Design a protein with these regions (language model features):
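Intein modules and their embedded homing endonuclease domains
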Residues: 2-128
Length: 128
């Protein structure tokens, strides 16, 4: 995944997380409670984001079309979201559990393409 597009997607999802709820989640004193609270915010942000799944592969909206994303890139996105939230160092060891939960969220967001629309490099043709 291109670096610029990755940063844009990271900022999109983080923008849906930040705020008072994230600040409150980071104030939790116990690591497990803090990770669970941030994980819940991450789930909600992914549900509202452009990330979805088609034929078993994650996709995201790049501004023009939905583009394919490797599962490894999705895993890196989850880790980088945790870093961007400024979670304490000990919390990163729980990233695999958070990733597992977030993958389930994406699995529930199936992309349904419209075969009546054809996308070209310079335009979109709607056959309806």
């Amino acid at each position: 995944m291109e670096s610029g597009k990755y940063r844009k997607l990271l900022n999109e999802v983080f923008g849906l997380m930040k705020g008072e709820k994230l600040d409150a989640a980071l104030q939790e004193s116990k690591s497990a409670a803090r990770v669970d609270a941030v994980q819940d915010l991450m789930r909600a942000a992914i549900i509202r984001s452009s990330i979805c799944k088609f034929n078993g592969t994650p996709y995201y909206f790049s501004g023009r079309i939905y583009e394919e994303m490797a599962w490894d890139d999705f895993g890196n996105l989850i880790y980088d979201l945790m870093r961007k939230c400024k979670m304490p160092n000990g919390d990163y060891s729980r990233v695999e559990g958070v990733l597992k939960v977030c993958k389930r969220v994406v699995a529930g967001k199936a992309l349904k393409p419209d075969n009546a629309i054809v996308v070209f490099n310079n335009c979109v043709f709607d056959m309806n």
